[in-house]
Amino acid sequence: MSETAKKVIVGMSGGVDSSVSAWLLQQQGYQVEGLFMKNWEEDDGEEYCTAAADLADAQAVCDKLGIELHTVNFAAEYWDNVFELFLAEYKAGRTPNPDILCNKEIKFKAFLEFAAEDLGADYIATGHYVRRADVDGKSRLLRGLDSNKDQSYFLYTLSHEQIAQSLFPVGELEKPQVRKIAEDLGLVTAKKKDSTGICFIGERKFREFLGRYLPGQPGKIITVDGDEIGEHQGLMYHTLGQRKGLGIGGTKEGTEEPWYVVDKDVENNILVVAQGHEHPRLMSVGLIAQQLHWVDREPFTGTMRCTVKTRYRQTDIPCTVKALDDDRIEVIFDEPVAAVTPGQSAVFYNGEVCLGGGIIEQRLPLPV
């Protein structure tokens, strides 16, 4: 290894993607070390929390690859900058995306600073399925090569400066290739299933978890025609377009379409439902977004044509974006879209390039 080899700290989660990322960087000649972040303090004896197992897996991978593993506890930062905001959004009747907040506040802020200042890193690396490309002296965020696994939606808040300090080795690969590399290397994470759900809730019941921190306020479930047909246990447990867990059965005779949440009246604590997943009340012609983050950090003025995702794994929607002021934009879709949800993120693309995004403040309903 040459004296000038750049030092990279890989965020080791105990999963297959970060494991293979570390090996790929070794192959590319970097001086590689790992960092395991503990972001959540679980109660003793809670089986669902896999932090200890994840740390053991991360350590086993680092031992196998011959690299040092550092650990750091960001639980206080996580609580203050991610979790408190997550609860506040739910309390206001919106549906936040904590993974996006975690990337913004922890992985590409607290971790990036810790790696550079405390560990002397030139770069950090993560197992995200995204790519970076440097154009005109600025780093751009691109979709991952594996369109099925692309995670650019979760990283839209990053600036070109943060991307310039970050490496995404698996973004250039397809997921099956990543698993194959891990198997060939005999890594313990090769067959480990991908983590799902919100990191601090893990596999456990979301409703039960949320209820610990926010007491539910029961209220009426009303149809779009104004008929009361049931009771909800708290608006925060429901999101637009939701069908399961309403407790009102599919339909009266079982012949009609099932009920879907089409609106939340936060002021009166009423959940509004309608039948059919393409009910006009569920459709939006556009949205207003705020808290904007553009990757190039240039203020957006005027209008542009691009595509948008209003949730992860959604097909790109062609749209026109218009600046309303410094921090708000209006987005008009070419075709109406179902279940556009305030609190979630709208993320914009120009082909492979992720331009940035913002938080959906309100949806623009289909004119009745």
UniProtKB/Swiss-Prot annotation:
One annotated Gene Ontology cellular component of this protein: cytoplasm
Organism: Shigella sonnei (strain Ss046)
The protein's role, per its UniProt record: Catalyzes the 2-thiolation of uridine at the wobble position (U34) of tRNA(Lys), tRNA(Glu) and tRNA(Gln), leading to the formation of s(2)U34, the first step of tRNA-mnm(5)s(2)U34 synthesis. Sulfur is provided by IscS, via a sulfur-relay system. Binds ATP and its substrate tRNAs.
PANTHER family: MITOCHONDRIAL TRNA-SPECIFIC 2-THIOURIDYLASE 1 (PTHR11933:SF5), TRNA 5-METHYLAMINOMETHYL-2-THIOURIDYLATE -METHYLTRANSFERASE (PTHR11933)
Subcellular location per the Swiss-Prot or TrEMBL entry: Cytoplasm
Family, per entry: Belongs to the MnmA/TRMU family.
UniProt KW keywords: ATP-binding, Cytoplasm, Disulfide bond, Nucleotide-binding, RNA-binding, Transferase, tRNA processing, tRNA-binding
Oligomer and partners: Interacts with TusE.
Top-level division of the source organism's lineage: Bacteria
InterPro entries referenced in this protein's UniProt entry, alphabetically: MnmA-like, MnmA-like_C, MnmA-like_central, MnmA-like_central_sf, Rossmann-like_a/b/a_fold
Annotated positions for site Interaction with tRNA: 128, 344
GO molecular function: ATP binding; tRNA binding; tRNA-uridine 2-sulfurtransferase activity
Residue span of region Interaction with tRNA: 149-151, 311-312
Active site residues per record: 102, 199
Signal peptide: none
Name of the protein described by the UniProt record: tRNA-specific 2-thiouridylase MnmA
Binding site for ATP: 11-18, 37, 127
Disulfide bond residue pairs: 102-199
A Pfam family recorded for this sequence: tRNA_Me_trans_C
Principal EC category: transferase
Region Interaction with target base in tRNA, annotated ranges: 97-99
A single BP term in Gene Ontology: tRNA wobble position uridine thiolation
